């Protein structure tokens, strides 16, 4: 199939007591009509409560997945890879160039189109001790596992106006190049 996508949930098989929470793989030939690739989740380790990303990486020639998990009580990001979108490596936590313990939600990680040897991400930093503020930050990597994080937000709460509070300042996945 030309298109693949994630769906988060649990198995709906009648009477299934071993149902696991996780990411389900879908496929579509046309991008309009979708079907499950298998009836059980393909990734079950993680929290899956924010933007779960999967994309084909033409440099590594495999699919990459980035999703959320709890790392010693702190919200963080995991990565795993697959050759077929069904069989994934064991997810591992991202590693950072600093020792900051920051809650990270959505990750918006992708290859940077103008320098494809780089990964770029805009994770949402959650600050529960500061009125549950959220702000996107910048991070980059050469291998998709080891990331450099910048401390300053990419978009502060003051720009544009009225972006204060929980769940009010996120960046979505993708970059748009302007002429």
Roles of regions detected by a PLM:
Residues 1-179:
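Carbohydrate-active catalytic/glycan-binding domains of CAZyme proteins
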């Amino acid at each position: 199939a030309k298109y693949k996508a994630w769906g988060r949930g649990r198995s709906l098989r009648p009477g299934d007591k071993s149902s696991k929470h996780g990411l389900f793989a879908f496929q579509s030939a046309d991008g309009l009509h979708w079907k499950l690739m298998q009836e059980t989740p393909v990734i079950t380790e993680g929290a899956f409560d924010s933007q779960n990303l999967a994309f084909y990486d033409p440099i590594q020639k495999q699919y990459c997945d980035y999703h959320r998990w709890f790392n010693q009580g702190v919200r963080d990001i995991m990565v795993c890879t697959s050759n077929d979108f069904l069989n994934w490596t064991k997810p591992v936590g991202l590693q950072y160039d600093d020792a900051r313990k920051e809650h990270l939600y959505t990750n918006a990680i992708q290859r940077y189109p103008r320098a494809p040897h780089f990964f770029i991400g805009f994770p949402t930093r959650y600050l529960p001790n500061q009125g549950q503020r959220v702000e996107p930050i910048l991070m980059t990597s050469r291998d998709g596992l080891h990331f450099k994080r910048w401390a300053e937000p990419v978009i502060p709460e003051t720009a544009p106006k009225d972006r204060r509070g929980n769940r009010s300042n996120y960046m979505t996945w993708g970059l748009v190049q302007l002429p």
